[in-house]
Amino acid sequence: MQKRTTPPPPLDITALFPELAPLARRAVRLHPRRGLKPGPGESKVGGTFLWPANEPWPMCSVGHAQTEPRRKQDAELLRREAETWGPVNERYPSGKPMPEGQPHGAYVGVIQLRVADVPELGFPEGCDLFQLLWCPRDHDHEEYSYYGPECRVYWRQSSTISEVLKEQPVPAIFDPHYMPQVCQFIPERIQDYPDVFALPEELQYRIWNWEETEAAQGHVYGYPDAAPGMKIGENVDWIQDPWFPPCPSCRQEMEHLLTVASWEWDGGSFRWWRPLEEPPLAHGVPLQDGQDTNDDAGITLGDAGNIYLFVCRRCPGWPIAYTLQCS
């Protein structure tokens, strides 16, 4: 069985700041890795999802952020998608796209998780499968300052799916940065700490002052705090200011569900977060750069950013919200 192990930290941050100890929370680093071909019902990035054959595959009907030349491509997009959907529609009539060119393109499967692999995600009663799909083109939602792929979440009971949709459509036009490579997840349970901006202000300043001293020896709290990469856990690896959206139903603050990340570590944080089992760096890449297998999923969100998914478990249907942050 494959595994990934986060290296022991080079320093004990709680010895320096004891107030952090009670703030530690369990996190699951998902560690997507290429090389294997997980089946339709397995936890993974990309590939064929466990999607019911009698359920329409989602098609995007939301306007895309695009230049004028991209708008002119919509006619070609619809023609190519009609060709792609022709043989599929013969077998799966319920999966036909809407007429009159209303859908702009097919969604793609991004992340699928089984409760058996990551119960920490928290599943609705009677469900054992989580699926995240998105439209792999940019969407501009000015009302909440979002620019990126349009996301949808599905919760399922896998035992009720008797026939899987084998030919899952591929969009004719897409941003290649939003098309995931097929990866297997290798979940790892760790303990991490809140992002510095989620800490009390007085503690923030003490940490920043420590970072300026010789005793810090180049360490910064931003490396050992919230684990980066694709993860499940209460402590969020924020790139910008922390922001938990209000639930669209009850207006109360939602909780972090899942982070979809461009990178698992970078040239500064790899000493803390590059798993011990990773193979030697290839192509003579200097170790201090740390740029090797940290982006196996092949996703780039803005300037190497993250999409954060949030859920409200208080309201029926568990409403979902999401945002994208990048540097």
Give the residues covered by each predicted segment.
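Preference for intrinsically disordered or flexible, low-complexity segments
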Residues: 1-327
